[in-house]
């Protein structure tokens, strides 16, 4: 058998395994969880507003991927889908974007963004928890395919679209502003590249299987996490906030 044909068969077999197993979302969850722990540790050692928000955002990413792994391995249900939709489709990118706001925007504006994010998190959580879920949408799912967005009713889709759009805008805008100002050029270039890779991963599912999404997310997460870690190591130009003295 020619080498090219043998390699094609191996690649096809590997893709078939990835398409029918929970390995891709599980590995994605582990990577996101490790990055979240790393960011939380950095926040504990040297606090900055962006760090805990990034840690929470990465933890939400891990929760969504873990729910997808569970749904793939044991079958999707109402609970696993709600967790997947809430943490992945609604909250994750918005919280990451709120963290980036503290690096790119004036502190007063970033605090407003933070307050709006908290309000949106509460609204989205309540909406997703009480929204009706069409269990019939889970019947024909195969491999790592996730349930369609139409499986959940109410106004959940509005929260998902709005929070994802604003969060992505904050992540991209924050990186671009810093690049233009030549502030933390390397870290912000990595953050921007990671966001683009994760976004493109969803687009590439049109040309390949759902496993393409998770493989793209793995790469994007590593690049995004590296950029965040790099930015934190470079430090912040702002002066530390003085402690509150209680008389």
Model region roles, listed by residue range:
Residues 1-16:
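N-terminal amphipathic/basic-hydrophobic helices that include classical n-h-c signal peptides
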Residues 15-21, 79-90, 145-163:
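Short aromatic-rich membrane-water interface segments that cap or initiate transmembrane helices
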Residues 19-32, 48-125, 214-222:
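Individual alpha-helical transmembrane segments in multi-pass integral membrane proteins
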Residues 34, 173-247:
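C-terminal transmembrane-bundle signature of multipass membrane proteins
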Residues 40, 65-69, 199-203:
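Alpha-helical transmembrane segments of multipass membrane proteins
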Residues 73-75, 103-104, 132-140, 233-244:
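A cytosolic-side transmembrane-helix exit/cap motif
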Residues 104-169:
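Membrane-proximal helix-loop-helix units in multi-pass membrane proteins
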């Amino acid at each position: 058998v020619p080498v090219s044909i043998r390699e094609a068969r191996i690649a096809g077999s590997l893709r078939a395994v990835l398409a029918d197993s929970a390995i891709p979302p599980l590995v994605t969850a582990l990577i996101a969880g490790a990055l979240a722990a790393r960011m939380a540790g950095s926040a504990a050692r040297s606090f900055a507003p962006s760090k805990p928000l990034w840690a929470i955002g990465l933890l939400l990413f891990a929760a969504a991927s873990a729910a997808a792994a569970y749904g793939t391995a044991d079958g999707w249900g109402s609970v696993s889908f709600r967790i997947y939709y809430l943490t992945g489709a609604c909250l994750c990118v918005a919280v990451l974007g709120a963290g980036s706001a503290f690096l790119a925007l004036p502190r007063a504006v970033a605090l407003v963004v933070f307050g709006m994010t908290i309000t949106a998190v509460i609204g989205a959580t309540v909406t997703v928890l009480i929204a009706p879920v069409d269990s019939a949408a889970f019947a024909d799912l195969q491999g790592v395919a996730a349930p369609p967005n139409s499986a959940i009713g109410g106004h959940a889709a509005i929260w998902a679209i709005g929070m994802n759009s604003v969060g992505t805008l904050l992540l991209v805008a924050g990186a671009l502003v810093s690049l233009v100002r030549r502030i933390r050029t390397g870290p912000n270039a990595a953050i921007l590249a990671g966001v683009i890779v994760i976004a493109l991963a969803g687009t590439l599912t049109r040309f390949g299987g759902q496993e393409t999404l998770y493989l793209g997310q793995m790469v994007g997460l590593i690049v995004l996490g590296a950029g965040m870690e790099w930015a934190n190591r470079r430090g912040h130009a702002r002066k530390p906030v003085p402690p509150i003295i209680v008389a």
